[in-house]
């Protein structure tokens, strides 16, 4: 029994060490070690990106051929970039795309405003209304997409704006926003299905989706 517990603790310690090394180095050989250790601990952790933005090439590949896609984002700029363009075309479209973005409407208990204040502490060009404006632009973009093709649902939420989740039926990209950096500069975890991290990412999304509000569509011009 003691040997079993020591083995489990050893695996967890090794996983933690490899995770730190992966964050420090971000090299592909290190990813293989992280993935091997994750199979022992059943976390499903496959890769660690130093910055969320450096994951976009792999994310684009995983989005191609996905049966469904779930996105929970703090701003949603990635939805308008090239990485997501295959989802908006009829040829490569998945069966279902669910998108959650923050509620940009004025309210006393706005978590979006809390994140704006947080970012403004390290980015002097980030005004209180800038994030709200950017979210509105991305909501408008996706709302128009929902009218142009089937299978896309858009909702808004007012919950702690502290992570981004992009998940498919095969994997999930999970970013925890730092209080001292933009999301694009925060580390991103790649979790394969099945696994503890993948399940946690889906639970995070589903909980937010259940308490979200359907976004009003913007009429096409």
Where do the model's predicted regions map?
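Hydrophobic, helix-forming membrane-interacting segments
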Residues: 1-33
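PLD-like (HKD) phosphodiesterase/transphosphatidyltransferase domain
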Residues: 26-117, 206-207, 211-214
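N- and C-terminal low-complexity/disordered segments
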Residues: 109, 119-126, 186, 217-221
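HKD-type phospholipase D/PLD-like phosphodiesterase module
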Residues: 112-162
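Short flexible/disordered coil segments
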Residues: 134-139, 159-169, 212-221
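HKD (HxKxxxxD) catalytic microenvironment of the phospholipase D
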Residues: 152-190
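Signature of lipid phosphatidyltransferase scaffolds
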Residues: 174, 178-221
């Amino acid at each position: 029994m003691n040997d079993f517990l020591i083995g489990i603790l050893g695996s967890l310690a090794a996983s933690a060490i490899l995770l730190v090394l992966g964050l420090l180095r971000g090299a592909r050989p290190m990813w293989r070690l992280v993935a091997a250790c994750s199979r022992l601990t059943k976390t499903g952790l496959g890769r660690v990106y130093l910055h969320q933005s450096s994951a976009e090439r792999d994310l684009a590949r995983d989005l191609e051929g996905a049966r469904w896609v779930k996105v929970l984002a703090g701003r949603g700029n990635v939805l308008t970039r090239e990485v997501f363009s295959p989802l908006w075309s009829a040829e490569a479209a998945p069966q279902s795309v669910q998108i959650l973005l923050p509620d940009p409407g004025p309210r006393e208990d706005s978590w979006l405003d809390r994140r704006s204040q947080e970012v403004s502490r390290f980015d002097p060009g980030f005004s209180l209304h800038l994030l709200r404006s950017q979210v509105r632009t991305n909501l408008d973009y996706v709302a128009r997409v929902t009218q142009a093709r089937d299978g896309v649902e858009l909702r808004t939420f007012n919950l702690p704006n502290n992570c981004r989740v992009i998940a498919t039926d095969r994997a999930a990209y999970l970013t925890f926003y730092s209080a001292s950096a933009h999301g694009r500069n925060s580390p991103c975890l790649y979790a394969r299905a099945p696994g503890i991290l993948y399940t946690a990412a889906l639970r995070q999304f589903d909980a937010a989706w259940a308490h979200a509000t359907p976004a009003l569509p913007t009429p096409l011009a």
